[in-house]
Amino acid sequence: MVRRKMDEKGVSPVIGVILMVAITVILAAVIASFVFGMSNVAPAAPPSAQLQVRTGSSADTVELKHMGGDPINCTSIKVLVNGKEESNALGSSGGCSDNLLKVGETETITLSGYGGQYVELTLVDIQTNKPILMTHVTVGG
């Protein structure tokens, strides 16, 4: 009986190709996980608070009462009346005396020139540029 010698030259390139393909697939998966952001970073959200707005006791004012939720930083709030920004509307009286409006505190918002009018009042968080409150109220007059 004649013994044949097996030719092993054909096996080596096949194994090499399989290893290169496997390494390429693993590398692509690692890069894709970084590119597509598989991280736990969530987009910033505005403070979540229950706010009550009512007609102010004096002319050109409304009262804002914090009923629950996150404290509101008075220095990072934009006040919009009928879609237009009101500068210096939040004062340093009442709840905002320490720049934070906390649960149970009330702040007076001055809206000059709107006395007696029914307006749309929006409070926007400056850091996220998202609304905290959107409501309609009659301004004290």
UniProtKB/Swiss-Prot annotation:
Record flagged with keyword Transcription regulation = no
Cytoplasm as UniProt keyword: no
Q: Which keywords fit this entry according to its UniProt record? A: Membrane, Transmembrane, Transmembrane helix
Q: What is its main location?
A: membrane
**Transmembrane segment boundaries:** 13-35
User: Where can this protein be found?
Assistant: Membrane
Q: Which Pfam families match?
A: Pilin_N
Protein name per its UniProtKB record: Uncharacterized protein AF_1096
Extract one GO cellular component term from the record: membrane
Q: Which InterPro entries match?
A: Flagellin/pilin_N_arc, Pilin_N_archaeal
Record membrane topology: Single-pass membrane protein
Species this chain originates from: Archaeoglobus fulgidus (strain ATCC 49558 / DSM 4304 / JCM 9628 / NBRC 100126 / VC-16)
